[in-house]
């Protein structure tokens, strides 16, 4: 699978810059084949030494050093720990951004592979393992290989290619900026002015050798919910003397689930709503004054997202009021819908079919996972 995506990113870049002949296509395929061993070696190195979001210090430096060795214009650090390489051919043509995310996750790796991660870190005040459990090690290695090949054929290219190695895709630590939004804020799409952006994501759920895609909304928007329910504290022996926020919270949780199942037109766009944490109380025999809940909302359409926000607030507040309590609802907008330009999708499909085979370039349904490549595709046509 890694070879397929590596070749695709390479071919996307070159196809936008010049119309390839069969001979040029064969040359790119051969260069990708020759680069494969190096890409695997890089991937295993990054897998063995993962770093958490906004803490990718060694990762970012290794990437920047590689880009410098290729003779590229390098900006580092960007967005705290990221790196940007710019290949200017000196000839008129489009400016193409190729993006890879570089952060790992607070996950303990449990296998006996020789390149398994044994890294540790502190996350939310706890000692945790660190693992590239989402494939970003592969993304880094692929883009490093693509950069090396394109730098080697610079004289045959036109336009400009911007290599974006982005930190903190998994989310910056609380209280910090990070990720694609911070890269954009720091101007990575402006100097040089990017015309189109490409990203990729490997998946263990996709058969090896297959590439999947979808025009328009591909991945969901992801928002965070915080609901604070306030009641009246009382002793468990006399619940009538207070207002039980735990019971109110239970009713709110059930009520929220009816929004998706009973109120939305699911033939238009889907949504998922999950309450994932609930905290309240200090003793087994005391009804608490307050309960806090958090959760996540996933939507596949911007209009649906706005409507869900309105209904969540209305449902929680009205249920609480009907039971003598209050509910404070905060919805924190996260990553927007990852939108694939229909025009770029139409252009890319025959390229994917050539590289993977027509039967293995598969249009799929939207996925409710989220990706902050969506911020790039909000600013420029993306795929």
Spell out what each predicted region is:
Residues 1-23:
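Bacterial Sec-dependent N-terminal signal peptides
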Residues 20, 69, 250-383:
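Metal-dependent amide/peptide-bond hydrolase catalytic core
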Residues 20-131, 141-158:
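Acidic/His- and Gly-rich active-site-bordering loop/insert found
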Residues 33-37, 50-61, 133, 137, ...:
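Soluble non-cytosolic domains of exported or imported proteins
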Residues 35-39, 43, 47-50, 70-71, ...:
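Sec/Tat-exported extracytoplasmic proteins
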Residues 46, 85, 98, 136, ...:
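Divalent metal-coordination and catalytic microenvironments
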Residues 120-131, 137-138, 149-150, 155-277, ...:
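Histidine/acidic-residue-rich, glycine-tolerant segments that coordinate divalent metal ions
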């Amino acid at each position: 699978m890694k070879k397929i995506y590596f070749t695709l990113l390479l071919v996307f870049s070159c196809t936008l810059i010049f119309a390839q002949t069969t001979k040029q296509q064969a040359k790119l395929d051969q260069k990708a084949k020759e680069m494969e061993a190096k890409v695997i070696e890089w991937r295993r190195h990054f897998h063995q030494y993962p770093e958490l979001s906004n803490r990718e210090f060694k990762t970012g430096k290794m990437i920047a050093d590689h880009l410098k060795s290729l003779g590229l214009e390098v900006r580092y650090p960007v967005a705290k720990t990221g790196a940007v390489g710019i290949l200017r051919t000196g000839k008129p043509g489009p400016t193409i951004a190729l993006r890879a995310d570089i952060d790992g996750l607070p996950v303990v790796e449990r296998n006996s592979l020789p390149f398994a991660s044994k890294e540790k870190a502190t996350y939310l005040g706890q000692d945790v393992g660190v693992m590239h459990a989402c494939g970003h090690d592969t993304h880094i290695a692929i883009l490093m290989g693509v950069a090396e090949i394109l730098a080697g054929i610079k004289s045959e290219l036109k336009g400009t290619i911007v290599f974006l190695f982005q930190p903190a895709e998994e989310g910056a630590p609380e209280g910090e900026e990070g990720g694609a939004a911070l890269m954009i804020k720091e101007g990575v799409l402006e100097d040089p002015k990017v015309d189109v952006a490409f990203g990729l994501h490997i998946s263990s759920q996709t058969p090896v050798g297959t590439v999947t895609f979808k025009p328009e909304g591909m991945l969901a928007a992801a928002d965070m919910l915080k609901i604070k329910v306030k009641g009246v504290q009382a002793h468990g022996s006399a619940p009538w003397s207070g207002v039980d926020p735990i019971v109110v919270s239970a009713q709110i949780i059930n009520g929220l689930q009816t929004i998706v199942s009973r109120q939305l037109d699911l033939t238009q766009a889907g949504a998922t709503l999950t309450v994932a944490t609930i905290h309240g109380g200090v003793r087994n025999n005391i009804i608490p004054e307050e309960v806090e809940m958090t959760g996540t909302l996933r939507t596949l359409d911007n209009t649906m997202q706005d409507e869900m926000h309105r209904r969540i607030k209305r449902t929680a507040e009205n249920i609480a009021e009907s039971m003598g309590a209050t509910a404070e609802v905060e919805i924190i907008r996260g990553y927007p819908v990852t939108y694939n330009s229909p025009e770029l999708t139409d252009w890319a499909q025959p390229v994917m079919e050539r590289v993977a085979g027509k039967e293995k370039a598969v249009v799929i349904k939207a996925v409710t996972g989220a990706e902050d490549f969506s911020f790039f595709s909000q600013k420029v046509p993306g795929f």
